[in-house]
Regions:
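Bacterial N-terminal signal peptides
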Residues: 6-16
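Periplasmic c-type cytochrome electron-transfer domains
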Residues: 17-336
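Positively charged n-region of N-terminal signal peptides that target proteins for export
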Residues: 1-4
Length: 336
């Protein structure tokens, strides 16, 4: 589970004399770029991230929000929030989790293959007065949970971690705990690179390996907007906009491209420089390590070198993201 903390504690790193100096990832809550793009480009990508979508843009038919910012806004666009989504399901006779069958339109259609229950729908409406597609949870679905919106700040550095780095985390964790805690690095499809896989690191279940895959998945499932990577609607009821909804603009980029570039350019969460020097904070840091919190919530990671191809060869790590040390205090593995 990829949980990037809302703030980051920077540790003093004792480097061996022969090791090359590590470059710290830019951190802050000022909404500026981490150096990946210039200010005008970052502002343009931010505008796309904050844009409120309408039905004419492809919003729905089922959706949770009308913009990325609606769920990712604290303390700046790209941050976390207390906005949550509902996931449900049930266990079969063998105890395995199964997704629900959700009936809509008075039983005329069944939505299968996903645990997400969308909060909103675009109909009934003036155009479709008798079509009822709002999702409701059947009594059969006993497994229910709310998941809050995750922080996106610093995710460009998370994407730039090598798969091997995350595999090594899993091995080291299991070794250090003598088999008591053995998180998994899960390989998942890279949607923009058919046939290729990478270690998942985005989403509550590490279900996405790249920020472009993540953008397309969220655009469809949270806003109901299709794209070249996710061209199929969850339901076509009440749908009057051609697919894919997300079409390239004058610059040749689709919204999902702008979203991915925006997230890649976000600074890492900043440390509270004053608070970190207090006796209480220093004592807490010692306890965090001593009781084993750091076993899962990793304090310091370093991205792959610039020039490294990732995401099935569809993205090459630029200088702004390559060879950068950051301090996520996050758990990047799946746990049973």
């Amino acid at each position: 589970m990829r949980l990037f903390a809302g703030f980051s504690l920077f540790l003093s790193l004792g480097l061996l004399s022969f090791a090359p100096p590590l470059s710290e990832a830019p951190a802050g809550f000022d909404g500026k770029s981490n150096g990946l793009v210039d200010d005008p480009t970052h502002a343009a990508d931010l505008a796309k991230f904050d844009e409120v979508e309408a039905i004419s843009d492809g919003l729905g038919p089922l959706y949770n929000a009308q913009s990325c910012r609606e769920c990712h806004q604290n303390p700046v666009s790209g941050g976390a929030s207390q906005v949550s989504e509902l996931r449900v399901g049930h266990r079969d006779a063998q105890g395995a989790f199964r997704n629900p069958d959700i009936s809509i339109n008075n039983g005329a259609e069944i939505i299968k293959g996903r645990s997400l229950i969308n909060d909103r729908a675009i109909c009934p409406s003036g155009a479709f007065p008798s079509t009822e597609i709002q999702e409701h949870v059947p009594d059969s679905e006993k497994v229910r949970t709310f998941r809050i919106s995750l922080n996106l700040l610093g995710d460009g550095f998370v994407e730039a971690l090598s798969d091997q780095t995350l595999e090594d985390l899993a091995k080291d964790q299991c070794k250090k705990t003598h088999g008591k805690i053995c998180g998994q690095a899960l390989y998942v499809p890279i949607v923009e690179s058919p046939g290729k896989t990478g270690v998942g690191r985005f989403g509550w279940k590490d279900q996405q390996a790249s920020l472009l895959s993540f953008s397309a998945d969220a655009y469809l499932n949270e806003m109901g907007i299709t794209s070249r990577l996710q061209p199929d609607e969850v339901t076509n009821l009440c749908n009057s906009v051609s697919e894919p909804n997300d079409k390239p603009g004058a610059d040749g980029l689709s919204d999902i491209d702008h979203f991915a570039r925006f997230m890649r350019a976000l600074e890492a969460p900043a440390r509270d420089a004053s608070l970190s020097q207090t006796a209480g904070a220093k004592h807490g840091e010692t306890l965090f390590e001593k009781v084993g919190c750091a076993t899962c919530h990793v304090a310091t990671l370093t991205t792959a070198p610039s020039g490294t191809p990732i995401n099935g060869g569809n993205f090459t790590i630029p200088d702004a993201l390559g060879g950068k040390t950051f301090h996520p205090y996050g758990d990047f593995l799946l746990h049973n």
